[in-house]
Swiss-Prot record:
NCBIfam families: PRK01736.1, ygfB_yecA. GO terms for cellular component: cytosol. Belongs to the UPF0149 family. It comes from the Bacteria. This is UPF0149 protein YgfB. It comes from Salmonella typhi. Gene3D superfamilies: YgfB uncharacterised protein family UPF0149, PF03695. Pfam families: UPF0149 (PF03695). HAMAP family: UPF0149 (MF_00346). InterPro entries: YgfB-like (IPR011978), YgfB-like_sf (IPR036255).
Length: 192
């Protein structure tokens, strides 16, 4: 089962976004929602925040709002399921070039970092493995390519980068959403 089975298809989501004049690709929108979830936003405040970031604070029309709720729910479910089902929402198919996928990946990562940053304002202070992954994501967001490159080689490299980004997103989710262990409740001795 893939996450695409639970959300509208990429082209359908693109149509909804274009109808609303949202100015984001489906990959960018998924990156933004994923970043917000991975940053620890797991309540209903994601919708107004999304509206503020993408639509000048205005709610989206019914079709797009419903599609975004499905995207949010499917993404959240995939991340909570130990991340095994979580996949980046990128264009696929024979008519999609490796360059289109590379551009979509850069957009996904940029918006993931935005979503992560609005939920974790001290992102630049994160250290350790997660801090390194965030630094790597910043570099990947600047992804560039030469159109004269061997497309087959570029496709293989792109798949490796996509998998790295997926794992980095899961690491962020684990870092920012796991329950912090609390001290066991100290029971006072009872006098009988």
């Amino acid at each position: 089962m893939s996450i695409q089975n639970e959300m509208p298809g990429y082209d359908e989501m693109n149509r909804f976004l274009n109808q609303q004049g949202a100015g984001l690709t489906p990959a960018e929108m998924h990156g933004l929602i994923s970043g917000m979830i991975c940053g620890g936003n797991n309540d209903s405040s994601w919708q107004p925040l999304l509206h503020d970031l993408t639509n000048e604070g205005l709610a989206f029309g019914h079709e797009l709002a419903q599609a975004l709720r499905k995207m949010h729910a499917a993404t959240s479910d995939a991340l909570e399921d130990d991340g095994f089902l979580f996949q980046l929402y990128l264009p696929e198919g024979d008519d999609v070039s490796v360059f289109d996928r590379a551009d979509a990946l850069a957009g996904w990562v940029n918006h993931f970092l935005l979503g992560l940053g609005v939920t974790q304002p001290k992102l630049d202070k994160v250290t350790g493995e997660t801090g390194e992954a965030i630094d790597d994501l910043r570099n990947i967001a600047q992804l560039g390519y030469d159109e004269s490159e061997d497309q087959e080689e570029l496709e293989m490299s792109l798949e490796e980068i996509i998998e790295y980004v997926r794992v980095a997103a899961l690491l962020c989710h684990d870092t920012f959403t796991r329950q912090q262990p609390t001290a066991p409740e100290v029971r006072k001795p009872t006098l009988h």
